[in-house]
Amino acid sequence: MYSAKNRFVQSVQRLQDFRNMYDYEARLATFADWPFTENCKCTPENMAKAGFVHCPTENEPDVACCFFCLKELEGWEPDDDPWNEHSKRSVNCGFLSLTKCVNDLTMEGFLRLEGDRIKSFYRKFSTVVLQYVEEEMTAATKRLLEYFSNQHQCSIDLDH
């Protein structure tokens, strides 16, 4: 089982990795081992256009995650439409509400969008962050108690 620290580190790494996923080609490149490639709606191209990144696990080879809202979907069927599945399960995703290409946004528009992406991350992973902080505080408290109990031990000689 992963500790809160491991989950926290993985979460932050995902946030950093996904900052490059505004680019369609970068998202598409993650689908090299995607199980659905032709004669279906959920092709790598359609998945990437809908904002998804391929995030397979050992047990689930078809896990896809939106780089923006971090919604993970698995159990894809050939007739599943990535846009429809995404919008049904993440109605407030900022990527889905874009009306123009990210490259056409003003700097202010892009920064606002990126701020929304980071807010999505913190909403999703706030419990992981809190668990990590609690574990660290517990460990620090234990170390302090051990330190002070060792430094201030009294020995009483009962023979004298």
Curated annotation (Swiss-Prot):
The keyword Zinc applies. Ubiquitination is required for centrosome-targeting. InterPro entries: Baculoviral_IAP, BIR_rpt. One of its GO terms (cellular component) is nucleus. Component of the CPC at least composed of survivin/birc5, incenp, cdca8/borealin and/or cdca9/dasra-A, and aurkb/aurora-B. Interacts directly with incenp (via N-terminus), and may weakly interact with aurkb (via N-terminus) to stabilize the complex. Interacts with GTP-bound ran in both the S and M phases of the cell cycle. Also found in a complex with ubiquitin-mediated signaling proteins including at least usp9x/xFAM, nploc4/npl4 and ufd1. C-terminus is required for spindle assembly. This is Baculoviral IAP repeat-containing protein 5.1-B. It comes from Xenopus laevis. The gene is birc5.1-b.
